[in-house]
């Protein structure tokens, strides 16, 4: 069986990475890095810096892949997002099939908390339930930008 970890890595500051995320990072054999184009190259660099900072040893590898893109401002937003997520599903499924051996652990590193505004959980859930792969997955929560911002301003979320 292959295992996927969807790891929340905080709101852009490596100090926001939780101990649960650090423990998860150290279980991973292959990290899938989604390249979203030249304007977002620093996001991949920061993900790799987080790995360098927190992973003990070098028993892991990085697989870079070009992430499907969407065109903002289209008339049918929901259809566009559905198409984008289908394209991501095809890519993720190919990566899992071709880049992971049975018994390996792969990971997607998600900014903030993966349960907020991110399609990765939904896409991996579809792949896992399809029956085409012997796959399990786990979600590791992270510090969201909302939490970090509230803390920085010394307030509570219920006061915003």
Stretches found by the model and what they are:
Residues 1-67:
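Glycine-rich, flexible N-terminal cofactor/catalytic loop recognition
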Residues 3-7, 102-108:
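Generic beta-sheet signal
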Residues 17-20, 87-94, 148:
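Well-ordered alpha-helical segments embedded in enzymatic catalytic cores
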Residues 24-27, 92-104:
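Glycine-rich phosphate/diphosphate-binding loops that line cofactor/substrate pockets in enzymes
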Residues 39-51, 72-76, 147-151:
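N-terminal beta-loop-helix "entrance" segment that forms/cooperates
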Residues 62-86, 97:
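Phosphate/nucleotide-donor binding subsite
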Residues 80-90, 155-160:
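A polyampholytic, Gly/Pro-enriched intrinsically disordered region
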Residues 112-160:
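Class I SAM-dependent methyltransferase SAM-binding "motif I" and its flanking Rossmann-like core
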